[in-house]
């Protein structure tokens, strides 16, 4: 059971921290773990309790806690959450709440394609000069589609038959 709790600890410790190795957890991720796993219920254990316990177990000048300190914090929160139970029973209940949990990303925005987005990104519906920027498959033409490329090889500016003069005279 403790190994499952340790896995959950490492998942939450690394959550949102690209530089974190997952061995130490900061206060933000500790609060998230307590909230997502149901340790913090809002009545007997509040966010204030979680912050106070975190501050108690961490070293004086540290900002993070290790798994060992985490276990102490969980014991203390468990005593408050499950009143009247033995410390071992409390620890089992807390580990049971944590089992198999992952950091939830509630409220995170997801990409959606609404009617306007479909209409604006469909290159077959483009008109005017924007139509020239894409080929039939919808792939962009690059700079050739964005700029008017002038061909200065003809006789005069509007001359279309460049390179055909020699063929006509012979």
UniProtKB/Swiss-Prot annotation:
GO terms for cellular component: cytosol; sperm flagellum. This is Tubulin polymerization-promoting protein family member 2. Belongs to the TPPP family. Probable regulator of microtubule dynamics required for sperm motility. In contrast to other members of the family, has no microtubule bundling activity. Its main location: cytoplasm. InterPro entries: EF-hand-dom_pair, TPP/p25. The keyword Chloroplast does not apply. GO terms for molecular function: tubulin binding. Residues 127-170 are annotated as: Disordered. One of its GO terms (biological process) is regulation of flagellated sperm motility. It is found in: Cytoplasm, Cytosol; Cell projection, Cilium, Flagellum. Keywords: Cell projection, Cilium, Cytoplasm, Differentiation, Flagellum, Spermatogenesis. Pfam families: p25-alpha (PF05517). The gene is TPPP2. It comes from the Eukaryota. Residues 129-149 have a biased composition (Basic and acidic residues). Gene3D superfamilies: EF-hand. Expressed in spermatids. Detected in liver cancer (at protein level). The keyword Cytoplasm applies.
